[in-house]
């Protein structure tokens, strides 16, 4: 789930999730995003911009922008199938077919994932059993080398089940559907280009009855966005980008926005512009601004400035940017009784959060070694936080308010090295001090120290490539709230071992994957993990 993700001290409310540049809709008024709806096998790469460093993106891009770029067809025609089986009866299957012949491209895939979950007997962390299935489609046509049009579609169904012996009368069933169209034009000399897109994304939340074949709709969330992007290169040293964006978000709920069915919506429109100048062939200066008018909170201008200098194998960067995040529908309008356990109340008087992000970084990129270090500071004013109150009857109530401010400072260090041609080492360390300036305490959920490490051996055996990898991540304790009390989690380190082997079968390829997750079987009630798990996977590609 996307709500478990944190980047540089900020949770998913401050992260903008995109697929091929288009926003993902959140799950109802809560706004959390189920990342399982993304077909992992179809990911080409993931681009991430830390902080509010780009004028191309608006509200919610305070902490980071994550853009998942999907694959394009590379063969005249190709097809494949993926199968994997893991502990806890976790099974994943996927089939796909694609064609990139001449001017027309097409791509389609369907998949099904299921698991028995874990912890149903009350022994540690719990995750419900589930069954997912979904599909993706992409169609494109190139009129000529300068003009193209593309259509996309995505569907995802997620059903999670109650544990054995549960007295619940229903279990959750959700659907996601998205469709989009985009097109572009570029001039003969490629100095001028224009792209336009429209995307529609809708989420359906339902309750599925246990003892009868009926489903009751409990809520929906939808987002319609349109975008126009114009790029002009008047010379070899100048690039100018300008554009406009519109977003309409709408939530309907029978229970979370009040005791009666209610619909709430938010709208914003944006204009943005950016200029990039290259001086002396090695210094890039990028400056720009974005104006966003939110129909709930009014207008805001967010300027940005960044510098990048290259010298031999070194690259140095510096940047300063402002940002804002408008409150979500949940933070504004929630009025929800959570099964008698607690109440959540929104606050329509909340103000938009504003941020100032500054960063410095240096990196070295040689033929066999890479290292980088980045320092940053993110000052957020009017930060929205949730606080808990025990009422006179002993019931727990949760509210939202703007705190005075929060300051987040940190340091990220990364390195990778190729040793003896076959051995690839990689590691990272992050220090993040995220302080609520009103209390002097760390922001809830912030991990102050974290890191990763991996060693991968690549080689050839039986006429095919293979790799053996050991990888781990570690985390220092973090605070969390439970039943009105603040507690501290345990520190942990989690390791995995992965073996992959490719077999060439004529023109086709067979890939075998063997994996052991949570190698040393770390378990803790605050850490949602079933313990040690084993996986075997097969991928067959027809060319």
Descriptions of predicted regions:
Residues 278-285, 376-379, 401-479, 539-541:
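Gram-negative outer-membrane beta-barrel transporters
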Residues 381, 425, 474-481, 488-490, ...:
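C-terminal beta-signal and adjacent terminal beta-strands/loops
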Residues 23-50:
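Short acidic/polar hinge/loop motifs at secondary-structure boundaries
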Residues 167-186, 219, 315, 322-380, ...:
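Outer-membrane beta-barrel signature, preferentially recognizing the C-terminal barrel domain
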Residues 55, 67, 74-76, 96-174:
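Periplasmic-side early beta-strands and strand-to-turn transitions of outer-membrane beta-barrels
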Residues 1-22, 26, 44:
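Extracytoplasmic beta-strand/coil segments of soluble accessory domains associated
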Residues 159, 202-204, 250, 295-301, ...:
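Surface-exposed extracellular loop regions of Gram-negative outer-membrane beta-barrel proteins
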Residues 107, 142-157, 173-298, 303-310, ...:
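Face-selective signature of the C-terminal outer-membrane beta-barrel domain
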